């Protein structure tokens, strides 16, 4: 099981992320798309990677956007798995 990252570690890692916010418990990002189906395609990519590494986000789907939240529900904070998934999403949305 992953360990919680310290606020200092999260701040350092966020420097490598693109537009992710941190509220003390989770990291979040809103991603906009040209079409609804583009957002659904991204949801599917995120779901496949989340299953592969066994670290699942909370996802909110809008018309042409999604909001992604990462936290460890078991530990109550941000872990390396959260950061790993955020980096994956940043790579897929360049």
Give the label of every model feature segment:
Residues 1-36:
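N-terminal first-folded block
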Residues 68-92:
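C-terminal structural segments of small proteins and small subunits
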Residues 19-22, 47-57, 93-94:
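Short arginine-rich
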Residues 44-45, 87:
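Solvent-exposed alpha-helix faces
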Residues 29-34, 66-73:
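Alpha-helical scaffold segments that form or flank carboxylate-/histidine-based iron centers
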Residues 62:
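RNase H-like, Mg2+-dependent phosphodiesterase core
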């Amino acid at each position: 099981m992953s360990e919680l990252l310290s606020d200092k570690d999260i701040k350092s890692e966020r420097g490598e992320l693109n537009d992710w916010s941190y509220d003390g418990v989770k990291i979040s990002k809103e991603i906009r798309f040209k079409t609804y189906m583009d957002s659904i395609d991204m949801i599917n990519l995120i779901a496949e990677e989340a299953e592969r590494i066994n670290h699942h986000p909370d996802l909110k789907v809008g018309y042409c956007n999604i909001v992604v939240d990462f936290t460890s529900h078991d530990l109550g904070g941000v872990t390396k798995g959260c950061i790993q998934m955020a980096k994956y999403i940043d790579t897929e949305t360049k």
